[in-house]
């Protein structure tokens, strides 16, 4: 059911999705779908929570381990891009829901396992103080890392058109970003 719902929500969005279409795609009747998920919003939240629960633990592990900021950036970039290769619908899905319902993320934020950047912020501040990193706000650095990793997935059709790449060539380009993005960010913040 969740896989069918994910596919319909991904292609039609929350507002365009219909419970009957989801039931048909899942090979069940609509009454059964309503038995498990009383309404479309509850089903959507289950799909979103399921998808987010796959990514959040990875982010938390990277953000809260004891490695250097450079290593965190490399691990985050590589893991995020590998994860998105397996779940390419997720970034657009999240952005779409945040635009449709900004309060939804506040509910998510209260869930156990929501990524916490406090240790990352402390580490950035310490590495700046130790002269390892150029002066930079930890929040700005985190936003830069997120933006450079998320945007190529959210804007895939646009970027494919700009770069004149088909799916296979675009996927190769994305694979190279595992090192390109990390190198770009690290070279911009590291004191050499």
Residue ranges, per PLM feature:
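Amphipathic, non-transmembrane alpha-helical scaffold segments
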Residues: 2, 44, 48, 52, ...
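C-terminal peripheral helix-coil segments that are non-catalytic and often amphipathic
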Residues: 79-82, 86, 114, 118-134, ...
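Short hydrophobic clusters on alpha-helical segments that form packing/core surfaces
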Residues: 1-9, 80, 185
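Hydrophobic alpha-helical connector segments
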Residues: 60-92, 130, 138-142, 175-178
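Helix-turn-helix
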Residues: 8-42, 46-47
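Amphipathic alpha-helical linker/stalk segments
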Residues: 47-75, 117-128
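Residues in soluble alpha-helical coiled-coils and helical-bundle/repeat scaffolds
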Residues: 27, 38-42, 46, 64-68, ...
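Amphipathic alpha-helical segments used for helix-helix packing
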Residues: 85-106, 156-164
């Amino acid at each position: 059911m969740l896989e069918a719902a994910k596919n319909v929500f991904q292609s039609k969005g929350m507002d365009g999705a219909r419970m009957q279409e989801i039931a048909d795609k899942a090979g069940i009747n609509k009454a059964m779908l309503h038995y498990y998920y009383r309404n479309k919003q509850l089903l959507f939240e289950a799909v979103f929570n399921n998808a987010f629960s796959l990514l959040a633990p990875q982010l938390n592990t990277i953000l809260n381990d004891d490695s250097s900021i450079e290593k965190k950036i490399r691990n985050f970039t590589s893991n995020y891009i590998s994860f998105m290769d397996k779940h390419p619908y997720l970034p657009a899905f999240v952005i779409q829901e945040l635009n449709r319902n900004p309060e939804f993320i506040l509910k998510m934020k209260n869930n156990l396992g929501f990524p916490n950047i406090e240790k990352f912020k402390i580490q950035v501040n310490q590495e700046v103080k130790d002269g390892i990193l150029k002066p930079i706000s930890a929040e700005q650095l985190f936003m830069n890392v997120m933006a450079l990793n998320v945007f190529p997935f959210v804007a895939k059709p646009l970027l494919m058109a700009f770069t004149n790449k088909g799916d296979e060539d675009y996927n190769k380009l994305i694979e190279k970003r595992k090192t390109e993005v990390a190198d770009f960010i690290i070279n911009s913040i590291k004191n050499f």
